[in-house]
Amino acid sequence: MHFRTPESLLTPAMRDVLSRMARANRPPFHTLTPGQARAAYESGSNVLELPRQVLARVVDFGIPVRDGHVVAARLYAPSTQKLPVLLYFHGGGFTIGSIDTHDGLCRQLSHLAACAVVSVDYRLAPEHQFPVAAHDAWDTLRWLAGHAEELGLDAHQLAVGGDSAGGTLAAMCALLARDTGLPLALQLLFYPGCASHQDMASHRRFAKGFVLDEAD
C-alpha cells in the first residue's frame, strides 16, 4: 500500500479527534503521576463523543478472584432475554482506564451487537504489578463461564474482547481458554499489544501525533 503521509490514512472523523486532542494541549501521560494520569484520562474519555446508549439493563456487581479481592464489574444488556455475553477489558497501558472511561463504548457494543457486555475493573499498575491484572482477567472469565446463567446470560455463547492493554488481556485469556478447554465463541481485539518489541515500521511511521507519541 502506497500513501503520501500517515495522516492520509485517517478518516475525517479521526482527524477531527486528533485535532481536538492537540488543541487541548495536555501534558503527556508519562510526565504525570499515576493518579494524575488516571484523572486526565477520565476527564478526556468523552473525546470520541459516543452517544450514551440507553439499555434495558445496566447493573454493577462484583466478581471474586483468587486472592480474595472482588473485581468491580458492570453488566450491559439491550434486553432482558438470555443473551450471548462479551467479557470486556478496557485499555490504558495497564495503568489507567476504568469501567467508567469505557462506559460509552461498552453501551455501544452491547447495542450494536445485540449482546450482553460485562466490563471489569482489573487492578492497575504500578500499585498492582504483573501478574495481578492477568490473574484478574483470567479469574473473571472463569467466574463468568460458571455464573453466566445466574445473570440471565448464555454461558454457551461467551466471548472475550478489549482495546489496547485490554486486548492483550483478552488474547491471553483466549489462549488460556484454549489450553484448558474453556469454550469461547470469539475474540474481539482492538489494537492489542501482542509482541514484546516496539520497533516495527508502523511504530516509526506513527511515532508523533497519533495519541501515543514516541518518547524524546
Identify the role of each PLM range.
Residues 145-160:
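Gly/Ser-rich "nucleophile elbow"/oxyanion-hole loop immediately N-terminal to the catalytic nucleophile
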Residues 162, 166, 170:
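Gly/Ala-rich beta-loop-alpha elbow adjacent to hydrolase catalytic centers
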Residues 100-120:
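Short amphipathic alpha-helix adjacent to the substrate-entry channel of hydrolases
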Residues 160-162, 190:
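Short beta-strand immediately N-terminal to the catalytic nucleophile in serine-hydrolase-like folds
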Residues 121-125, 193:
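Short beta-to-alpha linker loops that shape the active-site pocket of alpha/beta-hydrolase fold enzymes
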Residues 175-216:
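Hydrolase active-site cap/lid region
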Residues 83-92:
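Short beta-strand element of the alpha/beta-hydrolase
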Residues 1-71, 75:
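A glycine/proline-hinged amphipathic helix-loop "lid/cap" segment
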